[in-house]
Amino acid sequence: MPRIVNPLDEMLFKEVLKEQQRIRVYIERARYGKLKTIIEGIDEKEFDLEDIAKKLKAKLACGGTVKKGRIELQGDHRDRIKKLLADLGFSEELIEVE
């Protein structure tokens, strides 16, 4: 007999997972001395990194991609990224910005 999953339980589970994610935000130098903001620590098995990246790129008006299980955004967005991730449901206390 197949297991019936309550959609509400699944949503609550995702919210709890969001609040437990330890996220690290830092800067790397890209080609030609340009900066990129790196966001890592979001579980790619539980969350759609492409969707999160798409939302962040729209809010920050920048380009970016998902590579090796991390989100890369063009430019230095450390000052705004913590609030934007919190707006997406991640715990601000667990977001470390370097």
Curated annotation (Swiss-Prot):
It comes from the Archaea. Pfam families: SUI1. The keyword GTP-binding does not apply. One of its GO terms (biological process) is regulation of translation. CDD domains: YciH_like. InterPro entries: DENR/SUI1_TIF, SUI1, SUI1_arc, SUI1_arc_bac, SUI1_dom_sf. Signal peptide: none annotated. GO terms for molecular function: mRNA binding; translation initiation factor activity. Keywords: Protein biosynthesis, Translation regulation. The keyword Protein biosynthesis applies. Belongs to the SUI1 family. This is Protein translation factor SUI1 homolog. The lineage of its organism: Archaea, Methanobacteriati, Methanobacteriota, Thermococci, Thermococcales.
